[in-house]
């Protein structure tokens, strides 16, 4: 009886572990993640895909160039050049996401502020970019200046609340950004 209980216990642990880690790298490099929980690892679709719904947290959420819609798109949500729509687009979300070509609409499209990169990177540039297009909100000077100017001081409808995500750390990208 003791052995069978131990076996059942070990099987349960194995299943729980496999189930927990199954979200890691969900979508891998270029796929899409749809549904409630796409977090961990490269999270919601890795490099290039899109994340829709629920919690798309974990690193690189939204991937490089993809889009993050709804819920919580966690670290790097929105990625480089993608869009971040609704909910909380977390660390870097709307930063590179809104900054380098994409848009950040609604919720908190934050990103950090780094003294070494005061204007162009990390979420605040996203707010600046939105200031040009859709009207940014309270980011750094870009977010306040351009967002306040063309966004009528309030971010122009869906400008959101900039500058409340993570901190820009160039080492994460392994290079010159």
From Swiss-Prot:
- Give a yes or no for keyword Repressor in this entry: no
Alphabetically ordered keywords of this record: Repeat, Signal
Quote the biased-composition stretches of kind Gly residues, using this chain's numbering: 149-166
Q: Where are the sequence repeats?
A: 25-41, 42-59, 60-75, 76-91, 92-112
Give the range the annotation lists for the signal sequence. 1-18
Residue ranges, annotated region (5 X approximate tandem repeats): 25-112
Region span, Disordered? 149-177
Question: Would you tell me the protein name for this molecule?
Answer: Eggshell protein
């Amino acid at each position: 009886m003791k052995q069978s209980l131990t076996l059942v216990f070990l099987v349960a642990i194995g299943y729980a572990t496999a189930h927990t880690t199954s979200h890691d790298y969900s979508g891998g490099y270029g796929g899409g993640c749809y549904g409630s929980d796409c977090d961990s690892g490269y999270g919601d679709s890795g490099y290039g895909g899109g994340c829709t719904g629920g919690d798309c947290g974990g690193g690189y959420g939204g991937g490089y160039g993809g889009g993050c819609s709804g819920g919580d798109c966690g670290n790097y949500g929105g990625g480089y050049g993608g869009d971040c729509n609704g909910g909380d687009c977390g660390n870097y979300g709307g930063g590179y996401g809104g900054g380098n070509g994409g848009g950040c609409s609604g919720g908190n499209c934050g990103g950090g502020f780094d003294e070494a990169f005061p204007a162009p990177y990390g979420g605040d540039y996203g707010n600046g970019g939105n200031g040009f297009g859709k009207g940014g909100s309270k980011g750094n000077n870009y977010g306040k200046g351009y967002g306040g100017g063309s966004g009528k001081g309030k971010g122009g409808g869906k400008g959101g609340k900039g500058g409340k995500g993570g901190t820009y750390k160039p080492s994460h990208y392994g290079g010159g950004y």
